[in-house]
Regions:
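Short, intrinsically disordered terminal segments enriched in charged and Pro/Gly residues
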Residues: 1-9, 92-96, 100-109, 223-231
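Alpha-helical solenoid scaffolds that mediate protein-protein interactions
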Residues: 116, 123, 172, 179-182, ...
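Amphipathic alpha-helical repeat scaffolds of TPR domains
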Residues: 85-117, 124-157, 190-205
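Structural signature of alpha-solenoid helical repeat junctions
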Residues: 129, 164, 168-171, 184-192, ...
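TPR/TPR-like alpha-solenoid helical repeat scaffolds
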Residues: 188-201, 226-243
Length: 243
């Protein structure tokens, strides 16, 4: 039973009407109210943490009519050639219909993020953008793990989510590593120091200890990295010693 004054997830979100650039139809998508949820910080893989809501479930916009999907930052910013690629390769076969619900479940968030990955694939998006979507999927699965544990789910189910989280972290690691070598910052909206930090932290999760150390030490001696990021780097490097 919820306490008096305790906010529900629905208090943090609203329905926004959007016109799809691919099919031209209008639809409603749930988005987080700006400034409504209190920002707590980020975890070791930079998942944003808010009080009362996991905003990662609402990071993807997907048209329910044609299947076009992308992150909040990229939705509606594809070229006509890319939009046509979505029509030819996604919309022509899209049949999934989302039910009306008050909030988005983690399962639904996963499906939406995978549709965004499909959009990236058919539009020839940058490697970094695909890597960022893999990271988002890892964030979503991390949230699903926490929810499953809180609800007393079977260990088998929790282990399955943990497996998926690691798989997408591995994909994100490979993508960001390649993007760092082939793209100019900003990379997926992030500066080089942030990417280097992610390679340090994600590398540790993926067992790439030597590579993670190299990235981490390079960040610690960087003249452009913030003290906050350096302290976060020290924290994740410390986990190597503990383990």
């Amino acid at each position: 039973m919820e306490g008096i004054g305790q906010k529900k997830e629905t208090d943090y979100i609203f329905d926004k009407t959007i016109k799809c650039d691919v099919c031209g139809k209008e639809f409603k998508t749930k988005q987080v109210r700006t400034g409504k949820a209190r920002f707590i910080g980020t975890d070791d893989i930079l998942k944003p943490l808010y009080e009362g809501i996991d905003t990662c479930k609402y990071d993807i916009i997907m048209c329910p009519h044609c299947g076009y999907a992308a992150s909040l930052r990229l939705f509606g910013h594809h070229t006509e050639k890319q939009r046509q690629a979505v029509r030819d390769n996604v919309s022509s076969r899209f049949t999934a219909k989302e039910p009306e619900t008050e909030t988005y479940s983690y399962e639904r968030a996963v499906k939406r993020c995978k549709m965004a990955m499909l959009t990236e694939m058919v539009t020839g998006g940058k490697i970094s953008e695909s890597a960022y979507l893999c990271l988002k999927l890892a964030w979503i699965y991390r949230g699903e793990i926490q929810e499953a544990k809180a609800n007393g789910a079977a260990q088998e189910r929790i282990s399955m989510y943990e497996k998926y989280e690691k798989e997408y972290l591995e994909d994100a690691y490979r993508g960001f590593k390649q993007a760092r070598e082939t793209e100019y910052p900003p990379i997926a909206g992030m500066d080089e120091n942030t990417i280097t930090y992610l390679l340090t932290s994600i590398g540790i999760h993926c067992g790439k200890i030597d590579e993670a150390r190299r990235y981490g030490y390079a960040l610690l001696i960087s003249r452009t990295a913030s003290m906050k990021l350096k302290n976060k780097t020290r924290d994740v490097l410390e986990t190597i010693k503990k383990n």
